[in-house]
């Protein structure tokens, strides 16, 4: 999985490789996660003229901090036309999208969700109390994430009965592992983590169900 965040060229025999349907990309702030996700979208879209990718993101954030393109990529390439940006403001919008996923006549080859965890920050910025006055904001957030991931998981499993489709989402994590790891592991088989490696360099490690790969990259200008 790690190489698909960097290369736009499909690897030889790539169609025969086992790919998990859901992948999480977790790393610290300003580690190039959005750029890696967009590079992944380019990789999928470049593999075939029939491939389409839906890139779900916050409009203001993507416009103020657009993803970087790797060297050698032609910004005027037709492949960009096969990547559709879908602007979503809250977690309900993500659930509505996947609830209607089975109605799509032309299913995308991949769905990418940038800053997935940020769609649930409203639960941490407001105080939600139960009948006894106990703070319930963290629990409400966890339940909303579970509902969203479950809906996404079921939608992708159903879609793969018709054609190959996968979901890759990212989250910002200041520590060594995703903040909601116990939730993600229930629904997502492959978790790719990013760690700083000094001087603007980062180490990306992908842990799948049967393999582990790593890659080093830099976003220093």
Model-derived segments and their meaning:
Residues 1-221:
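N-terminal regions of ATP-driven nucleic-acid and macromolecular assemblies
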């Amino acid at each position: 999985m790690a190489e698909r965040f960097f290369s736009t060229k499909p690897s030889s025999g790539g169609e025969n490789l086992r790919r998990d349907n859901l992948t999480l990309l977790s790393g610290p702030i300003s580690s190039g996660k959005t750029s890696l996700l967009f590079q992944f979208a380019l990789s999928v879209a470049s593999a075939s003229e029939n491939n389409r990718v839906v890139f779900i993101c916050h409009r203001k954030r993507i416009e103020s901090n657009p993803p970087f393109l790797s060297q050698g990529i032609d910004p005027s390439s037709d492949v960009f036309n096969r990547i559709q940006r879908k602007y979503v403001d809250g977690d309900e919008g993500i659930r509505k999208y996947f609830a209607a996923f089975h109605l799509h006549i032309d299913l995308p080859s991949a769905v990418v969700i940038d800053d997935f965890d940020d769609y649930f920050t409203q639960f941490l910025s407001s105080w939600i109390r139960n009948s006894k006055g106990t703070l319930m904001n963290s629990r409400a957030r966890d339940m909303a994430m579970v509902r969203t991931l479950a809906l996404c998981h079921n939608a992708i499993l159903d879609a793969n009965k018709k054609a190959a489709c996968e979901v890759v989402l990212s989250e910002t994590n200041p520590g060594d592992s995703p903040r909601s790891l116990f939730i993600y592991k229930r629904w997502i088989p492959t978790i790719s983590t990013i760690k700083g490696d000094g001087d603007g360099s980062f180490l990306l490690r992908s842990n799948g169900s049967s393999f582990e790969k790593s890659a080093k990259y830099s976003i220093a200008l």
